[in-house]
Swiss-Prot record:
NAD(+) binds at residues 11-33. There is a cross-link at K65 (Isoglutamyl lysine isopeptide (Lys-Gln) (interchain with Q-Cter in protein Pup)). Its EC number is 1.1.1.-. SUPFAM superfamilies: NAD(P)-binding Rossmann-fold domains. The lineage of its organism: Bacteria, Bacillati, Actinomycetota, Actinomycetes, Mycobacteriales. Disulfide bonds: none annotated. This is Putative short-chain type dehydrogenase/reductase MSMEG_6031/MSMEI_5872. InterPro entries: NAD(P)-bd_dom_sf (IPR036291), SDR_fam (IPR002347), SDR_subfam_1 (IPR023985). Belongs to the short-chain dehydrogenases/reductases (SDR) family.
């Protein structure tokens, strides 16, 4: 039985670990070949979040190859349009086309109110989480159009792209901006049968969330909070009785939006949020 994206090629940013790796593996499980990029070094000033590494990206490569799918992987900063374009061009040449784009790369740092956020933190956040998304799509669109078969673009936003939380205003601004990109690209690219949607996760069990800084942000009342301490507060964000979801939960949404099952779905901000938006 053919996979749900059998024979397609997907370009995924932030693919070394976390949600990006999960997306690469899930799409490969369903028959896609992968173009994967990740910066593989620290960008955020938040030292509580361990940086992705070349070894992480190499592990993603091996996982995809283990599914008998092809993968082209490079270390690329999504703020560097020329580098993005080069790897997409090369990947398309090697793999034979492009059908799916998952603009997933992102960073997180928080703790300060907006008026006390440093310019460096603001610039990094907007550069990666908003401008990087735009540059990713910009690099990929010519291949989707020239392929003549339409395509699916999925942008990773957040529930923070639909509502606000304190102490992460630069993140909130970037993720709201992603929704604007999604809607505009959907309007502009629809004539080419290219669909554009966004996914809006709540807390996800990845290093971006499961780190000392986030735990202290959730539990400032404790000196050394752990995951169980954070879960007590995190669960209060949701209607369903969980503190966070797993990367594969987001990947299943990405797979649906990438597949022909969603052939007439475009301009949709899809939440995977355990009911967070109902709170």
């Amino acid at each position: 039985m053919a996979g749900r994206v059998e024979g397609k090629v997907a370009f995924i940013t932030g693919a070394a670990r976390g949600q990006g790796r999960s997306h690469a593996v899930r799409l490969a499980e369903e028959g896609a070949d992968i173009i994967a990029v990740d910066v593989c070094r620290r960008i955020s000033s938040n030292e509580d979040i361990p940086a992705s590494t070349p070894e992480d990206l190499a592990e993603t490569v091996e996982l995809v190859k283990g599914l008998n799918r092809r993968i082209v992987a490079e270390e690329v900063d999504v703020r560097d349009y020329d580098a993005l374009k080069a790897v997409v061009d090369s990947g398309v040449e090697q793999l034979g086309g492009l059908d799916i784009v998952v603009a997933n790369a992102g960073i997180g740092n928080g703790g300060a109110t907006l008026d006390k956020t440093s310019e460096a933190d603001w610039d990094d956040m907007i550069g990666v989480n908003l401008s990087g998304v735009w540059k990713t799509v910009k690099a990929a669109v010519p291949h989707l159009i020239s392929g003549g078969n339409g395509g699916s673009i999925i942008l990773t936003s957040s529930v923070g792209g639909l509502k606000a939380y304190p102490h992460t205003g630069h993140y909130i601004a970037a993720k709201h901006g992603v929704v604007g990109l999604m809607r505009t690209f959907a309007v502009e690219l629809g004539q080419h049968s290219i669909r554009v949607n966004s996914v809006h996760p709540t807390n996800v069990n990845t290093p971006l969330f499961m780190n000392e800084g986030t735990m202290k942000l959730f539990r400032p009342d404790l000196e050394n909070p752990g995951p169980d301490d954070m879960a007590v507060v995190a669960q209060m964000m949701h209607v369903l009785p969980v503190g966070w979801v797993e990367p594969r939960d987001i990947s299943n949404a990405v797979l649906f939006l990438a597949s022909d099952e969603a052939r007439y779905v475009t301009g949709l901000p899809m939440t995977v949020d355990a009911g967070s938006m109902l709170k």
